[in-house]
């Protein structure tokens, strides 16, 4: 499996950069992770291998993710069966040869809110908590030089490799690692995305400091997270669950989040978007059949979660490493 992560190509791509030494250490580190394994990894990898080995002469990444060929209709039964072996699909949507993968999240909506505020042309990008790589492909569509995503979830890796099967030559890599697995002071990326990660961290300031260590001087952080209304002293700490999630720790106001960024050493922090998450943007589908946002909100008051807390509201902030 490790050869399909294209780590040799990543080393060639990073030769001569501050990230090259790190790249040379990755094969041993990831081989050890694969050795640890996961009970479902063989089944998920088998689904990827059942995808037809064909070319995708038509690729769309700028306005959406879509792969097409002249044989779309003939390919669709095999493609759909293989991709259904990777359910649940959280982030998307994807169009594989006319098979519409209607994911739990309309991630294209978030991307339409975020992308106008960052110039990715020619940038080397790190996407922390990249999920199945949907945003990595969209970043390439926005002109990024290369995108490395990290996420320790094996299902997400296999979903990424399903797309990479048809986009092998594009400079996108998914590493099954957490931020904590990266060396300190990498300082090699122009732009870093952390979307939907901060509220899962027990120590949000430490997370921001670790993100800053990955950026070059002058590099840009794009931070998207759950927020609440309030001033710079407002932070919600759920007593137990938030929208049925146990691993949510801190929901700051936008003003508090800007303060956190300044304390972590970032400059020029600005909020570029605040949006309530709608039940049209996050919901169960054929490709993600479990409970989703409609079940996590109070049925009598959609402005509250089932726990009585403010319904999900997300902010995107952009800041610079001086």
Curated annotation (Swiss-Prot):
Give GO MF terms, alphabetically.
Answer: methyltransferase activity; transferase activity, transferring alkyl or aryl (other than methyl) groups
List the EC numbers from the record: 2.5.1.-
Q: Which biological processes are named by the entry's GO terms? A: tRNA wobble uridine modification
UniProt keywords, alphabetically: Transferase, tRNA processing
Annotated InterPro entries: CmoB, Mo5U34_MeTrfas-like, SAM-dependent_MTases_sf
Reactions catalysed according to its record: carboxy-S-adenosyl-L-methionine + 5-hydroxyuridine(34) in tRNA = 5-carboxymethoxyuridine(34) in tRNA + S-adenosyl-L-homocysteine + H(+)
Name the residues that bind carboxy-S-adenosyl-L-methionine: 91, 105, 110, 129, 179-180, 195, 199, 314
Per the similarity annotation, which family is this?
Answer: Belongs to the class I-like SAM-binding methyltransferase superfamily. CmoB family.
Function according to Swiss-Prot or TrEMBL: Catalyzes carboxymethyl transfer from carboxy-S-adenosyl-L-methionine (Cx-SAM) to 5-hydroxyuridine (ho5U) to form 5-carboxymethoxyuridine (cmo5U) at position 34 in tRNAs.
Q: How does it assemble?
A: Homotetramer.
Q: NCBIfam families of this UniProt entry? A: PRK15068.1, tRNA 5-methoxyuridine(34)/uridine 5-oxyacetic acid(34) synthase CmoB
HAMAP family hit by this protein: tRNA_carboxymethyltr_CmoB
Its protein name is tRNA U34 carboxymethyltransferase
Which organism is this entry from? Pseudomonas paraeruginosa (strain DSM 24068 / PA7) (Pseudomonas aeruginosa (strain PA7))
Classification lineage: Bacteria, Pseudomonadati, Pseudomonadota, Gammaproteobacteria, Pseudomonadales
């Amino acid at each position: 499996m490790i050869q399909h992560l294209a780590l040799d190509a990543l080393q060639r791509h990073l030769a001569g950069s501050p990230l090259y030494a790190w790249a040379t250490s990755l094969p041993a580190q990831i081989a050890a992770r694969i050795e640890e394994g996961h009970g479902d990894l063989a089944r998920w990898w088998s689904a990827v291998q059942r995808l037809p080995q064909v070319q995708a002469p038509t690729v769309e990444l700028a306005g959406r993710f879509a792969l097409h060929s002249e044989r779309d209709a003939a390919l669709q039964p095999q493609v759909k069966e293989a991709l259904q072996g990777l359910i649940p699909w959280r982030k998307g949507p994807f169009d594989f040869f006319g098979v519409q993968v209607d994911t739990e999240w309309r991630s294209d909506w978030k991307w339409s809110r975020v992308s106008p505020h960052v110039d990715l042309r020619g940038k080397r990008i790190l996407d922390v908590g990249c999920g199945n790589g949907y945003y990595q492909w969209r970043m390439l569509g926005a002109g990024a030089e290369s995108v490395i995503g990290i996420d320790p979830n094996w299902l997400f890796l296999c979903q990424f490799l399903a797309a990479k099967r048809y986009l092998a030559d594009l400079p996108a890599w998914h590493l099954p690692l957490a931020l904590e697995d990266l060396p300190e002071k990498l300082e090699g990326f122009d732009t870093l995305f952390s979307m939907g990660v901060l509220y899962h961290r027990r120590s949000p300031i430490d997370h921001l400091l670790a993100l800053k260590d990955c950026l070059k001087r002058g590099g840009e952080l794009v931070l998207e997270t759950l927020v609440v209304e309030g001033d710079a002293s407002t932070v919600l700490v759920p007593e137990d669950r938030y929208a049925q999630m146990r691993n949510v720790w801190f929901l700051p106001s936008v003003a508090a989040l800007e303060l956190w960024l300044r304390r972590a050493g970032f400059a020029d922090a600005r909020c570029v978007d605040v949006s309530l998450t709608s039940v049209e943007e996050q919901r169960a589908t054929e490709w993600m059949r479990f409970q989703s946002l409609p079940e996590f909100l109070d049925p009598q008051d959609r402005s509250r979660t089932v726990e009585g807390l403010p319904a999900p509201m997300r902010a995107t902030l952009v800041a610079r490493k001086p």
